[in-house]
Amino acid sequence: MGSDGTSAATAEAAIVPGQAREVWKNTILAGLANYIDAGSIVAGSAALALWASAYGLSTSFIGLLGAFSANAISAGVGALIGGRLCDRFGRKRIYQYDMLFYAFGMMWLVFATAPWMIVVGFVLVGLAVGADIPASWSLIAEQAPTGKRGKHSGVAQVLWYLGPVVVMVMFFVLAPLGLLGARIVFAHLAILALALTLLRSRMKESERWTQAQEEAKRARLAGEASAAISPWRELMRPKHLKSMAFLIGMYGMWNLWAGTNGFFFPYILSTVGNQTQAVSVGVQALNFGLGIVSIIFIFMKFADRVNQRLLFAISALMQVVAMALLAVFPLTLPVALLHVVLGGIAVGFGAQSFFQLWSSELFPTRIRSTAQGVTFAVVRFGLGIWSFFVPALTATGFHTLAWILTGFLAASGLIGIIWAPRNEGKSLEEIEAERSATA
């Protein structure tokens, strides 16, 4: 990347303790998008049974909510639009003001009194969280020091899992309040989004993005041929298409499992497994809590230092075994707990964490957020289409659905094991130089 890479590498080498604290603070502020995204998904899932009972929602309508929620199509559209805007106007503009839009959407869920209001709220919230993901993930990768990018990405993933834990604990406490308790949970997410808007206003723009813009401007003034290539045309180059195909395959297959498990698991437990609402959300909270422990003590500790492909393979195998338990055995609370413990540990250093890391590493700064937005959008679109049919599949036999989800995890694992990159310990500039040399 020429001067961009040189200056960025110099800046990394010059980081002092005070600056390091600032970088970590920015990582947390950017990563809170993950808290809000995952918290929104799980809050909606935990409220699903309550809404179904209060409004007499049909199986088809429940599928519609899943398809257009923050977990699927709406988030995909938001990521597609937000990713391109991030590369064009900067990361800060998107991640600062996007949370206001999120709060507006969440208020529809807080005050929803009819099914159509729930749909509107889900769509608006999904658009907002989708737009924020490329902005926050790009910023985290671009400001992280070389050799610590996985650790900084891990912080965002901890927040991704912390959101559901907080939401689930709140549902435990507020369960006697029924729908009022759900409204309180949604309100806490809206308030956090407003606070995050204020805190993010003090953050600086990504230095790498600023340098990339300056370099592009110099190239245009010099009449260089590379300056005439549009970002979309650049994204369509074979090496980038291959990277997107890998990411979509690996994360897309995994997300079909995760999206179904995350959005419908409490619903499945309370209907098919005949567990109470409190027990179902408690089991899910345990899953996310184990994920946090796994991220901190496995992913953040080893992702920058060991063979990432091997780390991914171990996680993939554990998740396949965990999901197969639900396919083979009757859906009882002990089986669900074993599934949660084994799978919860595995997901912390698996596809979700590596998707954030690899999607930030495999594309140059000029198109990084755009590429992340495209891959994220395709994955969420696929999940949205799939989610529409999950309630009907569950009604015809949960074990059939469990076998299908086991197959998704196996496919994701194979794709990751075969094509995973080896970027541990490298700077973004080193990765780009290597990819340019082999293109």
What are these regions (language model features)?
Residues 1-42:
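Cytosolic juxtamembrane N-terminal segment immediately preceding the first transmembrane helix
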Residues 45, 239-292:
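Extracytoplasmic gate region of multi-pass secondary transporters
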Residues 45-77:
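Extracellular/periplasmic helix-loop-helix junction of adjacent transmembrane segments
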Residues 121-158:
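Cytoplasmic helix-loop-helix junction between adjacent transmembrane helices
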Residues 149-175, 192, 376-386:
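Glycine-rich segments within core transmembrane alpha-helices of 12-TM secondary carriers
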Residues 79-90, 294-307:
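Helix-to-loop junctions at the C-terminal end of transmembrane segments
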Residues 93-107, 310-324:
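Structural signature of the two symmetry-related core transmembrane helices
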Residues 90, 111-116, 329-331:
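Helix-breaking motifs and short loop linkers at transmembrane-helix boundaries and internal kinks
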